[in-house]
UniProtKB/Swiss-Prot annotation:
Protein name per the record: Odorant receptor 56a
Domain of life the protein comes from: Eukaryota
Ranges facing Extracellular side: 63-76, 159-196, 314-323, 411-419
Tissue-by-tissue expression: Expressed in olfactory sensory neurons in the antenna.
Cytoplasmic side: 1-41, 98-137, 218-292, 345-389
Length: 419
């Protein structure tokens, strides 16, 4: 059981240049709370209610899918929506269970960023600003399609409810094929909409609102954590190449140090680099443990769903609205898989450059004990760093394999349908 005081963040954390936007949405959701917030317990309870409602919506959507559809065109978009909610339900439940780990990672990251902003030089500040701009761009790329899809669904529902009420409330006509049902009406397993207005009509509105916020919010937040790790590795590589002992003590004047004093301070700098590398490794391990289950679920679910949507687009005759939603779903799913595999690849490649940074630091000017120490540090830096989601490695090769696998199964389904 969580203790409220263990889940509170300092007010300055919500102004963090990398995580600030996501934390403000998390605060609205009730996932985190501020130390200066009134009644934080009520906020955290709200998170429990919203997470439970996501699972309830997912269960209702899956129940509707299991009832089946008369043809592929009617069920493709609803099936894709239900499966998307199943994937996000797994991710949100995992996030809820491991909320203390998320808070711990945020505290570590915010503390590091605050220290960096105080001691960074111009080049390091440029890296921080570039990381901030990058995370905002990625967030927009995932958020905008989700919001557009949600607004289109809301607009379609409002327009047809006001001007084409028979396509919304005349269920017998819809079942006879005389009227085409709106997407929201197809999500939940209820018969007469008028008898279940609150649950059957307003319920999907509420579920859709949760979906278009929760799905991009969590995935882009994890992207920020991964990009933060990449930033830390970039700065570590830069500092290793510079080998500037004045970072330890700004009052040092290198020209006035004796050989033994210079060796001492360089040794201290080596120790700081090793400690920093170990801290980064620990952070990556914690992050990997946090995301391994939902990313593995996304790997399986999205692979099947991408294949199914291509099959539905090829074999069926979807409406223009269904075409739009299918393409949005394909883009969002591919984008979610890509951000995990791409940023894991960036982390691994940036870590692999650390041994080269040690080699480029002017080692030939060091005393022999330092050169021997540097050899061991290079060997330590060459230890591979990999990110895994249970059974699969997170890298671009895996992402390409997902695309190949989905296309292969799509061709198999299409061939079996033709014959």
């Amino acid at each position: 059981m969580f203790k409220v005081k263990d889940l509170l963040l300092s007010p300055t954390t919500f102004e963090d240049p990398i995580f600030g936007t996501h934390l403000r949405y998390f605060q609205w959701y009730g996932y985190v709370a501020s130390k200066d917030q009134n009644r934080p317990l009520l906020s955290l309870i709200r998170c429990t209610i919203l997470t439970a409602s996501i699972w309830l919506s997912c269960a209702l959507m899956l129940a509707r899918v299991f009832r089946g559809y008369e043809n592929l065109n009617d069920g493709a978009t609803s099936y894709a929506t239900a499966v998307q909610y199943f994937a996000v339900s797994i991710a949100m439940f995992n996030a809820y269970v491991q909320r203390d780990k998320v808070i711990s990672l945020l505290r570590v990251a915010h503390s590091d960023i605050q220290n960096l902003m105080h001691e960074a030089d111009n080049r390091e500040m440029e890296l921080l600003v570039a990381t901030q701009a990058y995370t905002r761009t990625i967030t927009l790329l995932i958020w905008i399609p989700s919001v557009i899809a949600g607004l289109m669904a809301y607009s379609d529902c409002i327009y047809r409810s006001l001007f084409l009420p028979k396509s919304v409330f005349n269920v017998p006509a819809v079942r006879r094929g005389e009227e085409h049902p709106i997407l929201l009406f197809q999500l939940f397993p209820f018969g007469e909409l008028c008898d279940n207005f609150v649950v059957g009509y307003l319920g999907p509105w509420y579920a859709l609102g949760l979906g278009i916020t929760a799905i991009p919010l969590w995935h882009t937040f994890i992207t920020c954590l991964m990009k933060y790790v990449n930033l830390k590795l970039q700065i570590l590589n830069k500092r290793v190449e510079e080998m500037d002992i004045t970072r330890l003590n700004s009052k040092l004047v290198i020209g006035r140090l004796t050989a033994s004093e210079l060796t001492f301070w360089q040794m201290q700098l080596f120790k700081e680099f090793v400690k920093e590398q170990l801290r980064i490794r620990k952070f990556v391990q914690e992050l990997q443990y946090l995301i391994c289950v939902p990313v593995m679920a996304d790997f399986i679910i999205f692979s099947v769903l991408i294949c199914f949507l291509f099959f539905a687009l090829t074999v069926g005759v979807p409406s223009k609205m269904d075409y739009f939603f299918m393409f949005i779903y394909l883009f969002v799913m591919a984008g979610i898989l890509w951000i995990y595999h791409w940023h894991a690849t960036l982390i691994v490649e940036c870590h692999d450059e650390l041994s080269l940074a040690y080699f480029s630091c002017g080692w030939y000017n060091f005393e022999m004990p330092l050169q021997k120490m540097l050899v061991f540090m290079m060997m330590h830096a060459q230890r591979p760093m990999k990110m895994r989601a249970l059974l699969v490695d997170l890298n671009l090769r895996t992402f390409i394999d997902i695309g190949r696998g989905a296309y292969s199964y799509f061709n198999l389904l299409r061939s079996s349908h033709l014959y």
